């Protein structure tokens, strides 16, 4: 029994040795075993389990089998080195702007973001932005702003850096409402005038400038004019003009004045493309946000106010439309608010639980939770929202309805009437009057449209018209007066008393005809014939020679040739029409003098008539006095003025006028050739 156990122990020991040798030969290619496996292997070895028995047992005489040779190791695998690119192209970085690969030192890193561009592209980009007065510089690839220190480091140009700093200063000062820049050319001096509204005269303190300008209109000081008058005087010089072959300048095209306006803060001119864009504009120079229609700095609620400005329209609402909208809002506000509240309450009571249930269900949908827990959470949320939704609806309606009513009946009417848009005025003890007419001042755009199609006719009667007035003094003459303060350049022709006082009122003629033909060197012209009836020595009428161009500065006036032919037909037996020479303009009219035995009495009573065309500078008549004289004259377009019996003679002069009338009637058959024809050939008017 003992021998059998010794043989079994030796056999197991030999097998274990062979197994360990095999592991040693195979372990060179495998990682070493973990310490736990080695410990288990040592514990399972039989000599360690039975140390005493192995020593006492004699060694067997049976030789152990030779160990098997280990397998040859696998040949080493050579890993080829990575191929090196020629010229070191791995160190080059591609610029995202010009797509050129450049070394890293030519592509700096921006401090505000991680985008990188080459120095050449960055300098060109900054140069373009600064030259166009855009100092809010950003990264070319994103909206991150560039710091001034980084801009200076990239530019390395003293002149461009100075311009950039000047534009930065101007942008900061433009936000100050009391900052005023000197209007003199090449003067960059600014005056910060606090509390100078009552004393608007400012003086530039720069040495060598000393320009005086106005605090309100920010232009050169106008001592004898208001800001509106000075603005109207400067308005024609702002428009771009084109020359007509006749020498008259008109606007370039229709609507060009509406496409170009100046910023209300920095006065930089801005052109708006007619592409259907909105009216909310942002100045790229100073960053001012303003409305293109009213040209005022606005907020986000401007287009919701009753100002009449629309977000997409091309012009603001008229006063009539604003008043109608206001009245309809006041009347329909209770109905509309009640309807909104009636719809909002059930919508909130039903919609809030549905919204809460869907949100809770969507949150638990992607999570591995039990079905019962999910249903419990959704049910609890819906029950709580059903309880809270009526309270939320009541609070919302209770707060929202009073706010809407206060806005409709309080804020809207006050803001509308404060801006003068409601047109409600109180008459002198006659109650409240609502004015629907637009009586605003004439803008540059309106004057520009009026310049496009100048005409001679009925449309020109709206401005200062030519007035042919007569007086009883025989020394009065025919003169031309040019209006300086009217919207359209017009001429006032004053006929002397030699026509009415010396000839017509003398009882030798019942009427005379004045035919005016004006030629402004245009393709078409209009001819008007008017008749003058004499009642008294101061009879006057109003005739328009034509609206030529709108009022502009005298130094910008051009020379236009106007040909006026005046045909004066009268019935006296004899009269003489003489002329006096002037410096530049001449008016000469002559009539043949025919003597007869029957007209000897008439010839003694008719005095010589002189008609003189004076220079425009020689007449300084007031516009109001000219209009006052012309208000008493009837319309000239009527054909009834051609009749000799247009105005009934007064009873006191009836007996005095009838004998000469019979005398002239007898002379018609004998002296038909005595009708005079006077022509004013060419009058050169300096406009």
Swiss-Prot record:
Binding site for Zn(2+) 3: 214, 217, 222, 227
Catalytic activity: [E2 ubiquitin-conjugating enzyme]-S-ubiquitinyl-L-cysteine + [acceptor protein]-L-lysine = [E2 ubiquitin-conjugating enzyme]-L-cysteine + [acceptor protein]-N(6)-ubiquitinyl-L-lysine
Positions annotated to bind Zn(2+) 1: 95, 98, 118, 121
Chief localisation class: membrane
EC number: 2.3.2.31
Membrane topology of this protein: Multi-pass membrane protein
Regions that span the bilayer: 330-350, 391-411
GO cellular component, one term: cytoplasm
Function: E3 ubiquitin-protein ligase which accepts ubiquitin from E2 ubiquitin-conjugating enzymes UBE2L3 and UBE2L6 in the form of a thioester and then directly transfers the ubiquitin to targeted substrates, such as UCKL1. Involved in the cytolytic activity of natural killer cells and cytotoxic T-cells. Protects against staurosporin-induced cell death.
Any Pfam family hit: IBR
Binding site for Zn(2+) 5: 291, 294, 302, 309
Subunit and partners: Interacts with UBE2L3, UBE2L6 and UCKL1.
Record field: compositional bias (Pro residues): 60-85
Family affiliation: Belongs to the RBR family. RNF19 subfamily.
Segments for region (TRIAD supradomain): 91-313
MF terms in GO: ubiquitin conjugating enzyme binding; ubiquitin protein ligase activity; zinc ion binding
Residue ranges covered by zinc fingers (RING-type): 95-144, 263-294
Ranges of biased composition (kind: Acidic residues): 629-641
Start and end residues of each stretch annotated as Disordered: 53-88, 618-662
Zinc finger (IBR-type): 161-227
Residues the entry annotates as binding Zn(2+) 2: 182, 187, 204, 209
Coiled coil feature spans: none
Gene: rnf19b
Name by which UniProt lists this protein: E3 ubiquitin-protein ligase RNF19B
Superkingdom assignment: Eukaryota
InterPro entries linked to this entry: E3_UB_ligase_RBR (IPR031127), IBR_dom (IPR002867), TRIAD_supradom (IPR044066), Znf_RING (IPR001841), Znf_RING/FYVE/PHD (IPR013083)
């Amino acid at each position: 029994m003992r021998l059998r156990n010794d043989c079994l122990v030796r056999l197991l020991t030999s097998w274990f040795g062979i197994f360990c040798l095999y592991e040693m030969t195979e372990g060179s290619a495998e990682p070493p075993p973990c310490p736990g496996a080695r410990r288990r292997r040592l514990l399972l070895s039989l000599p360690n389990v039975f140390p005493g028995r192995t020593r006492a047992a004699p060694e067997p005489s049976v030789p152990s089998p030779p160990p098997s040779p280990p397998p040859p190791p696998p040949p080493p695998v050579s890993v080829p080195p990575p191929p090196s690119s020629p010229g070191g192209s791995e160190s080059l970085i591609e610029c995202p702007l010009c797509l050129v690969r450049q070394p890293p030192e030519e592509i700096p890193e921006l401090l505000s973001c991680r985008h990188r561009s080459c120095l050449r592209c960055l300098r060109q980009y900054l140069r373009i932005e600064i030259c166009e007065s855009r100092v809010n510089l950003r990264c070319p690839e994103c909206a991150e702003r560039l710091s001034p220190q980084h801009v200076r480091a990239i530019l390395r140009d003293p002149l461009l850096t100075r311009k950039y700093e000047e534009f930065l200063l101007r942008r900061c000062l433009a936000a100050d409402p009391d900052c005023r820049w000197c209007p003199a050319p090449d003067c960059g001096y600014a005056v910060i005038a606090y509390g100078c509204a009552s004393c608007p005269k400012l003086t530039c303190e720069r040495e060598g400038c000393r320009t005086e300008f106005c605090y309100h209109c920010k232009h050169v000081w106008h001592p004898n004019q208001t800001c509106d008058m000075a603005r109207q005087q400067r308005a024609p010089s702002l428009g771009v003009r084109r020359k007509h072959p006749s020498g008259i300048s008109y606007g370039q095209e229709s609507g060009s004045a509406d496409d170009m306006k100046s910023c209300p803060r920095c006065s930089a001119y801005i052109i708006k493309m007619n592409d259907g864009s909105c009216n909310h504009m942002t100045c790229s120079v100073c960053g001012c946000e303003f409305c293109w229609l009213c040209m005022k700095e606005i907020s986000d609620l401007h287009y919701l106010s009753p100002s009449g400005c629309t977000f997409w329209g091309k012009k603001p609402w008229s006063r009539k439309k604003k008043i109608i909208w206001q009245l309809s809002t006041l009347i329909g506000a209770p109905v509309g608010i009640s309807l909104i509240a009636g719809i909002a309450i059930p919508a909130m009571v039903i919609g809030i639980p549905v919204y809460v249930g869907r949100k809770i269900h969507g949150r638990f949908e992607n999570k591995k939770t039990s079905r019962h827990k999910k249903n419990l959470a959704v049910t609890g949320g819906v029950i709580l929202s059903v309880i809270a939704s009526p309270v939320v609806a009541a609070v919302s309606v209770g707060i929202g309805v009073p706010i809407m009513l206060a806005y409709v009946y309080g804020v809207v009417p006050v803001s509308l009437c404060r801006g003068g848009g409601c047109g409600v005025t109180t008459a002198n003890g006659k109650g409240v009057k609502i004015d629907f007419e637009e009586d605003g001042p004439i803008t540059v755009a309106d004057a520009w449209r009026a310049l496009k199609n100048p005409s001679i006719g009925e449309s020109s009667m709206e401005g200062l018209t030519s007035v042919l007035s007569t007086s009883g003094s025989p020394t009065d003459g025919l003169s031309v007066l040019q209006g300086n303060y009217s919207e359209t350049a017009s001429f006032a022709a004053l006929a002397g008393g030699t026509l009415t006082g010396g000839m017509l009122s003398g009882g030798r003629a019942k009427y005379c005809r004045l035919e005016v033909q004006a030629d402004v060197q245009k393709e078409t012209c209009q001819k008007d014939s008017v008749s003058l009836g004499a009642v008294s020595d101061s009879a006057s009428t109003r005739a328009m020679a034509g609206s030529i161009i709108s009022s502009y500065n005298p130094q910008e006036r051009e020379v236009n040739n106007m040909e006026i032919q005046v045909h004066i037909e009268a019935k006296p037996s004899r009269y003489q029409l003489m002329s006096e020479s002037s410096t530049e303009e001449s008016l000469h009219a002559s009539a043949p003098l025919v003597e007869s035995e029957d007209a000897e009495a008439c010839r003694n009573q008719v005095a010589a008539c002189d008609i003189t065309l004076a220079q425009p500078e020689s007449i300084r008549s007031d516009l109001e006095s000219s209009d006052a004289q012309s208000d008493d004259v009837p319309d000239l377009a009527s054909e009834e003025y051609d009749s000799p019996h247009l105005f009934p003679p007064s009873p006191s002069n009836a007996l005095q006028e009838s004998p000469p009338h019979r005398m002239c009637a007898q002379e018609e058959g004998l002296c038909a050739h005595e009708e005079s024809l006077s022509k004013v050939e060419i009058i050169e008017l300096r406009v």
